[in-house]
Curated annotation (Swiss-Prot):
Pfam families: Conotoxin. GO terms for molecular function: ion channel inhibitor activity; toxin activity. One of its GO terms (cellular component) is extracellular region. Disulfide bonds join C52-C64, C56-C73, C63-C77. Keywords: Amidation, Cleavage on pair of basic residues, Disulfide bond, Knottin, Neurotoxin, Secreted, Signal, Toxin. Belongs to the conotoxin O3 superfamily. InterPro entries: Conotoxin (IPR004214). The modification Leucine amide is found at L78. Residues 1-20 form the signal peptide. This is Conotoxin VnMSGL-0122. Residues 21-44 form a propeptide. It comes from Conus ventricosus (Mediterranean cone). It is found in: Secreted.
Length: 79
C-alpha cells in the first residue's frame, strides 16, 4: 500500500509542476506584451511640433505630443 501511495504522491507532484510551469509561461507572455505596448506608445506618441511646444509653454506645461490633432499638455508626460 505504501508503494501505491508514493506513486500517487509522485504523480500529483508532477501534475502540479506541469500546470504551474504552463501558468508561468502565460504570465511571462502577458508581461512581455504589456512592455511592448508601453514601448510602442512612447515611441509613437512623442511627435512634438514647435506649435505644440509653444502652446504648452504658454500654459507652463510640457508638450506630450498631439492627440486627435490637438496639443496634449501635461506637467509630466507618461507613456
Amino acid at each position: 500500500m505504501s508503494g501505491l501511495g508514493i506513486m500517487v504522491l509522485a504523480l500529483l507532484l508532477l501534475v502540479f509542476m506541469a500546470t504551474s510551469h504552463q501558468d508561468g509561461g502565460g504570465k511571462q507572455a502577458t508581461q512581455r506584451d504589456a512592455i511592448n505596448v508601453r514601448r510602442r506608445r512612447s515611441i509613437t506618441r512623442r511627435v512634438v511640433t514647435e506649435t505644440c511646444k509653444e502652446y504648452c509653454e504658454d500654459r507652463d506645461k510640457t508638450c506630450c505630443g498631439l492627440e486627435n490633432g490637438q496639443p496634449d499638455c501635461a506637467n509630466l508626460c507618461l507613456g
